[in-house]
Amino acid sequence: MTDQELGITESKEHNPGEWYAEVVQKAGLADYAPMGGFIVTRPRGYALWERLQDHLDGWFKETGVQNTYFPMFIPESYLEREKDIVDGFDPEVAWVTHGGHDELEERLAVRPTSESIITPFIAEWVRSYRDLPLRVNQWCSVVRWEATETKPFFRTKEFLWQEGHTAHATEESAWDETMTRLEQYERLYEEVMAIPGMTGRKPEHDKFPGADTTTTIEALMPDGKSVQAGTSHYLGTSFAEAFDIEYTDEDETKQTAHTTSWGLSWRALGALIMTHSDDQGLVIPPALAPTQVVVVPIWQADTEEAVKEYAADLAAELDEQFRVELDDRDERNPGFKFNEHELQGVPLRIEIGPNEVEDEAATLVHRPDGESDVAERESITDAVDEALETVYAKLYASAEATLEENIRKAHGRGEILGTLGQHGGYVKTGWCGDEACEAEIKDEIAAEIVMLPLDEDEPPVYDTCGVCGDEATETAYFAKSY
């Protein structure tokens, strides 16, 4: 890549769509596939997904979840056993009708989600209350044939995700499960991705098909749009009834199980890129960065040996605790290396020149803002640890400020539309519960109710609906969304 090719030419502030696409490609995260709606995930992009997966998978296993894998094809008859699934996903289902030249006796759906193939097996595995709770998860891809413009990680017909499925003896146990997973998603965004999230629940008309309650974590992007960052569904007994998940309780009485499902996709990577990156390229929080620290030696002919040796020793020491790269390439000058590692989002750069060697020191440069510090060589590990914590804190503080500055109240159709149109972000208003009131706003400005408060008993922010003026029963958060 040449110096000209290396730079980001689009502006995040003025042209966020083109800027985002340029960062994704030039930072080596993904390319566009020859088929519309699909992308090729490059090694650096997949490494981000693996880091995210490692965190989440570890937490799942700590709370009793076991990984499994189910076929990507689902018989049509299985989908039809849960009517809400059919109605909810039918327009987006990709169908396999032939095997080679032979027409199949029954169409096979390429999984849009896996409740319909996993739940029948849970029914086989559960016989007694002793088998509950049962918790399984799979990391896989799903296909939803949406007629939307391709936006890597945000909107693709095929995407990677995890989907968890559980069965429980009681509503209380299943609801606790639903909240546990939502809290883990929130933890992932806040502690690992440095993105504050807002948790809530979806309105009745926007729940997962067949769910009793859909909870969500929403993340606000710098362009004022909301991202549905992860969802956790309490499914009640609807799926258990459709697929005969019954168990014998302690009194030898047949009971119907309560089930949950929960999922997070690589849309999280889209949120990560959009939130933190800048006009120099990708910015990644240290916990997710494939390379956390890059050591760049800077030498002249008469100092090359000493500088390289010093830098290599320092990198080797740091590599025991951090993910470190030593960039001692001869064919690239320091300026090119700095720009390249900034483009790729390495959180911390360490510069080693003759002065650092002489002073037994190192210059540490933070990726988010270019702030630099000089650390003593003997305490370099502690200095790097502190610097990475500072980088995380800077990223979180910036994202938190964006969120706090973009939650507003509005009442009345004109004020809601005006606030959304001028500022974007979230607009809180009273809502009567009628989908038609949401439709008025959605038709006018393409904003929708992205969430309601988790606590159904929380008093509405206004006594009357912000759209129709009838009595309000909820606080609704309107936003434009990805």
Swiss-Prot record:
Query: Which keywords does this Swiss-Prot/TrEMBL entry list?
Result: Aminoacyl-tRNA synthetase, ATP-binding, Cytoplasm, Ligase, Nucleotide-binding, Protein biosynthesis
Cited function:
Catalyzes the attachment of proline to tRNA(Pro) in a two-step reaction: proline is first activated by ATP to form Pro-AMP and then transferred to the acceptor end of tRNA(Pro).
Any one of the GO CC terms: aminoacyl-tRNA synthetase multienzyme complex
Main location class? cytoplasm
Annotated EC: 6.1.1.15
Q: Give the protein name, as stated in the record.
A: Proline--tRNA ligase
State the species of origin: Natronomonas pharaonis (strain ATCC 35678 / DSM 2160 / CIP 103997 / JCM 8858 / NBRC 14720 / NCIMB 2260 / Gabara) (Halobacterium pharaonis)
GO BP of this protein:
prolyl-tRNA aminoacylation
Q: Which GO terms describe its molecular function?
A: ATP binding; proline-tRNA ligase activity
Q: Which SMART domains match?
A: ProRS-C_1
Instruction: Please give the superkingdom of this protein's source.
Output: Archaea
- Domain comment (free text): Consists of three domains: the N-terminal catalytic domain, the anticodon-binding domain and the C-terminal extension.
Report which reactions are catalysed by this protein: tRNA(Pro) + L-proline + ATP = L-prolyl-tRNA(Pro) + AMP + diphosphate
- Subunit text: Homodimer.
NCBIfam families tied to this protein: proS_fam_I
Family that this chain belongs to: Belongs to the class-II aminoacyl-tRNA synthetase family. ProS type 3 subfamily.
List locations, semicolon-separated. Cytoplasm
CDD domains reported in the protein's UniProt record:
ProRS_anticodon_zinc, ProRS_core_arch_euk
